[in-house]
Structure formats: C-alpha cells, structure tokens
Amino acid sequence: MAGATVTVEEVRKAQRATGPATVLAIGTATPANCVHQADYPDYYFRITKSEHMTELKEKFKRMCDKSQIRKRYMHLTEEYLAENPNMCAYMAPSLDARQDIVVVEVPKLGKAAAQKAIKEWGQPKSKITHLVFCTTSGVDMPGADYQLTKMLGLRPSVNRLMMYQQGCFAGGTVLRVAKDLAENNRGARVLVVCSEITAVTFRGPSESHLDSMVGQALFGDGAAAVIVGADPDERVERPLFQLVSASQRILPDSEGAIDGHLREVGLTFHLLKDVPGLISKNIERALEEAFKPLGITDYNSIFWVAHPGGPAILDQVEAKVGLEKERMRATRHVLSEYGNMSSACVLFILDEMRKRSAEDGQTTTGEGFDWGVLFGFGPGLTVETVVLHSVPITTGAAITA
C-alpha cells in the first residue's frame, strides 16, 4: 500500500486558523411592545387579577422602583394575556399556550437580530459556516436553530448547535463556543444568536414565592446576534472585538442559588441564596485567573461587560473590585433600557459599548481601553469569563448601519 501523501499534523495545521476569533458584526432586536417600569406594577396586578393583594403589590412596586430599569420590551401584550388567563394565574397549567408562542417567536426575533448582524458584516450569507443558537425560552424539535436556518436561507450544510435552558450565563457560553469553532476551522464564519422571550416565565404574584416576583420585575425580551470569525479579511470585514480567552466555572457553595424548572405551569424561577454576595465573593478569583497571565491587576484599566442580573449584583461587584462607576456604564444602560434579557444581555452591552465608544470619540471599541472582560452569571451558580481585546476605531467604524 502506498504511503500517505500528508500527515495528520499537516491536516490539523491546515484546518486551523492563524489568529484569534474576532467579533465582526453585532445586531439586536426587541418586540414592538414596550413596557415602562413606573407603570408596570399597576398593569401587572390588573392583568393577573391580583389587585386585591394590596400589600404584595406594594412589595412589587418597591422591587420595580429599586430595579434601576426604566423600560422593557415584552412579546406578551395585554390582549394576548386576556385571551389566555391561565398564563396570568400563579400556578395554572399553561405550558401548551406558552410553547405555542415561543416556538414561533423565538426564531422570529432571532432572525431580526441576525439580519442586522449580517447586514453590518456585509458578506454573503453563503459564507456562514456555523450557527450557534441559544434560548431559555421553550424546547422543540427540530429546534430554533433549524427554523432560523430556513428563515434566513442559510446553506443546508451549515453546522448547527442548539443550546436550550442554559440561563443568564449563556451569552458568555456562546462566545466561548464560537471562539473554539472559529479558531479550529480555518475560514469559518459563525453566526451566534441569543433569543429570549419571557412568555415561558410570566405568571401572577404569590406571597409564598417572592423570588418569582423578582423575575417578574426584572426580565424582558430581546435577541442579539454576532458574527465571529478568525483571520478577518479587512478589505471587506471590520473587526470589533477579539476573543482572547474564555472559561467557565461553577462557584463553590452555590448549589441551588438560581434554579429554573420547566413544568406544566411554565418555567418556574427560584432564587434560593444570596446571589449578589456569592458572585462578588468570587469575582476577584475569576479576574485574577483571567488577567494575571496578561500582567493586569488594575481592573479600572479594562472595559467591563457584565451580565446585569440585577442592580445588587452590579453594586456588590463594583464595591468588591473598587470599580469606578463609569466602568459599568454600558452594562447599566442596557439594564435600564431593556431589563434582564438573560443570555442576550452581554451582546447588547457589547453593541452599546462599541457604538458609544465611537460616538464619544474614543480611540478603541472598548471605551478607549485595550483589554476588557465579559462576565456571564447564571444557574449553577455558573460564571463565564471571556477576555476581550478591543480594536482601534477608525472614522465611521463601530457604528451599525
């Protein structure tokens, strides 16, 4: 038998990219229905027929007042909820009605975000080699990844990965996965989509489940998409952020801190421990592991993209690390204008950061800083840590069309 003409090592080398994975475009989308936080307690208790629960309504109003959220977007309209009263009850069987919404609307909202990212990228859809789709909203077969592939007209040979029921940390997870795909497949262009709709978690209030009410005060709907690829062709592609390293960790002594369970009543949400305290207690270790190899110990000298699980998390992280308030500006802006959109949040923050950096005349997409960190926090407690490197801003760059 004739000897092989190439070695495995040569094949492996040819398969791999040379440079780091890079974010090449970002797109975001929300439902049209906008809910202002100041009006939400009255609306929420009226639509769930809970106005007789006056003390609970006052508690909920205080939650909303402290949330630092100005407005959110929600697919569920008052008209739809009026037609589906079981979704408004605290624990009424309603999974079928919820599923009917999310299996259609999750890929549809994802499509809107993906189209914006593809338009900014400016390359033919046929160049997309991989699709990573993430949602905590509903499960179906074939999944939202398949539906989006059909909706966008992607090649039938696109390599798909569907991630269901990950939770709020997954905006970091999808970037970690996309980094590995882009760097280990020369020429790969990965479309990443996070699409979240609260139709699975919406329900009426209960004195016995106040942590569910916390979710009702915080969560909103949104989708975000990014194009990730290594070795960008800068004649036609515009790098935004490089993905330098990525890791995932389960925090010690945090089991049960955040749980979600899919039941006949929908997705139930449970906060069982001091989540802000657990995250802030472990944040320095995560930062040291990520930035010590780079010789960075001043965390005010990097840009910050942190999942805004709630204002208390951001407050305690700031205090623990000694952050200047300006470091969390992009994060707090997204919390204020959209609420907690689970996995999509950190991608919204990346979008806000690169746009504001250009508008403010900064030298880089990372608010003038070279290095940055992206944190995802969620069920587990699980933390995703992504080290980012910004790129220089040229005239007209870093702002979407």
Curated annotation (Swiss-Prot):
Protein name: Chalcone synthase 1
Function: The primary product of this enzyme is 4,2',4',6'-tetrahydroxychalcone (also termed naringenin-chalcone or chalcone) which can under specific conditions spontaneously isomerize into naringenin.
PANTHER family named in the record: CHALCONE SYNTHASE, HYDROXYMETHYLGLUTARYL-COA SYNTHASE
Domain of life where this protein originates: Eukaryota
Catalysed transformations (reactions): (E)-4-coumaroyl-CoA + 3 malonyl-CoA + 3 H(+) = 2',4,4',6'-tetrahydroxychalcone + 3 CO2 + 4 CoA
One Gene Ontology term of the molecular function aspect: naringenin-chalcone synthase activity
Gene Ontology terms describing biological process: flavonoid biosynthetic process
Family: Belongs to the thiolase-like superfamily. Chalcone/stilbene synthases family.
Organism: Sorghum bicolor (Sorghum)
Active-site feature positions: C168
Pathways involved: Secondary metabolite biosynthesis; flavonoid biosynthesis
UniProt-listed SUPFAM superfamilies: Thiolase-like
Keywords: Acyltransferase, Flavonoid biosynthesis, Transferase
EC code: 2.3.1.74
